[in-house]
Amino acid sequence: MRTTISQLKEMKQNKQKIAILTAYDYPTAQILDKAGIPAILVGDSLGMVVLGYDSTVSVTMEDMLHHLKAVVRGSQKALIIADMPFMTYHLSPEQALLNAGRFIQEGGAQAVKLEGGVNVADKVKRIVDCGIPVMGHIGLTPQSVNQLSGFKVQGKTLATALSLIEDAKALEKAGAFAIVLETMPAELAAIITAGISIPTIGIGAGEECDGQVQVISDMLGMFTDFVPKHTKRYADLNGSITKAVSEYAAEVTKGAFPTLKESFTLDKKVLEELKKCVL
């Protein structure tokens, strides 16, 4: 049985931290289930860490549905949350509802995530009113990276901090079940967390959030060119995979792989008969 929205809210009430990770494929989803991760985010971050885009802006509904379906097939226990891509909910509450519905009906997600605060509250309410759980996302919102002039810490001034607090309260009022707080001062995240009844999930927002989410490629060390400040590397998969692939290539080149152990053989009698037929 999958984690429920109510269970996540109970975790906040009981001061039990919520660990969330992204996943984009079947085997990763299986591993996260096995490790006991209660919720999986199929993030539009896949645009950058899987598809090689410069930002998340280029990600489409089709991209998301393709990866979402794979994650759903691989997971049996985690709550699956799907990111709504850029321009799939911005035009109207009806557009937002239709696309959110696709993630639930076609993709098999249990919830969707939208970026924005006051400006998307009407979309959140419309989706929630139709029975689809919504996670909010404020602070650094990657889909607005061009407007924000890059991936920068948000809420560092009094005005912007107050604006983010207003965003959080608007999302709670609209019916969001949780809110991602991304790349903001830890003190501000703590104030927001204490001021709302729904769970806050931090990414670069300090330790006082009700839970944390990380991009799995970052925390597993898949890339060497960039490591976000908010990420702790729990493995060096880039190094491990590079070493393994190099060893494989070297063994193939010198004829050390495959050996008899990795090969299949014919019955001796069949082999003898075969040789008579072809030699």
Swiss-Prot record:
Homodecamer; pentamer of dimers. Its cofactor is Mg(2+). CDD domains: KPHMT-like. This is 3-methyl-2-oxobutanoate hydroxymethyltransferase. The keyword Ion transport does not apply. It is found in: Cytoplasm. Its main location: cytoplasm. Catalyzes the reversible reaction in which hydroxymethyl group from 5,10-methylenetetrahydrofolate is transferred onto alpha-ketoisovalerate to form ketopantoate. The active site is at residue 182. 3-methyl-2-oxobutanoate binds at residues 44-45, 83, 113. InterPro entries: Pantoate_hydroxy_MeTrfase (IPR003700), Pyrv/PenolPyrv_kinase-like_dom (IPR015813), Pyrv_kinase-like_dom_sf (IPR040442). Pathway: Cofactor biosynthesis; (R)-pantothenate biosynthesis; (R)-pantoate from 3-methyl-2-oxobutanoate: step 1/2. It comes from Dehalococcoides mccartyi (strain CBDB1). GO terms for molecular function: 3-methyl-2-oxobutanoate hydroxymethyltransferase activity; magnesium ion binding. Keywords: Cytoplasm, Magnesium, Metal-binding, Pantothenate biosynthesis, Transferase. Mg(2+) binds at residues 44, 83, 115. Gene3D superfamilies: Phosphoenolpyruvate-binding domains.
